[in-house]
Amino acid sequence: MASTNFRPLHDRVVVKRVESEEKTKGGIIIPDTAKEKPAEGEIIAVGPGTRDDKGALVALDVKVGDRVLFGKWSGTEVKLDGVDLLIMKEADIMGVIG
């Protein structure tokens, strides 16, 4: 798991993409130019949550270490401490794996 000193605000999360296989089950090697960006990742930081209508803090459903699925174009790509990461809102996450 990547370590970062970045703390997201509100309902944002920091996600590290999980790299896809470089070879198919049939043994065909996939070149970097043909690979799609993986839509699966691991959460490495979460914000405190959002506020409801009464001002109470509502915590996020995801936590650090969760493996999640998200849309192919979700989030903003950033590089922190030399690591490529995504910052996205919790609403961009489709679900938790496992």
UniProtKB/Swiss-Prot annotation:
SUPFAM superfamilies for the chain: GroES-like (SSF50129)
Main location: cytoplasm
GO MF annotation: an example: metal ion binding
Keywords for this protein: Chaperone, Cytoplasm
Localization of this protein: Cytoplasm
One GO cellular component, as annotated: cytoplasm
Domain of life: Bacteria
InterPro entries named among the record's database cross-references: Chaperonin_GroES (IPR020818), Chaperonin_GroES_sf (IPR037124), Chaprnonin_Cpn10_CS (IPR018369), GroES-like_sf (IPR011032)
A Pfam family matched in the record: Cpn10
Chaperone among keywords: yes
Any one biological process term the GO annotation gives: chaperone cofactor-dependent protein refolding
Subunit and partners: Heptamer of 7 subunits arranged in a ring. Interacts with the chaperonin GroEL.
Physiological role: Together with the chaperonin GroEL, plays an essential role in assisting protein folding. The GroEL-GroES system forms a nano-cage that allows encapsulation of the non-native substrate proteins and provides a physical environment optimized to promote and accelerate protein folding. GroES binds to the apical surface of the GroEL ring, thereby capping the opening of the GroEL channel.
Family per similarity comment: Belongs to the GroES chaperonin family.
UniProt-listed PANTHER family: 10 KDA HEAT SHOCK PROTEIN (PTHR10772), CO-CHAPERONIN GROES (PTHR10772:SF58)
UniProt name for this protein: Co-chaperonin GroES
Species the sequence originates in: Allorhizobium ampelinum (strain ATCC BAA-846 / DSM 112012 / S4) (Agrobacterium vitis (strain S4))
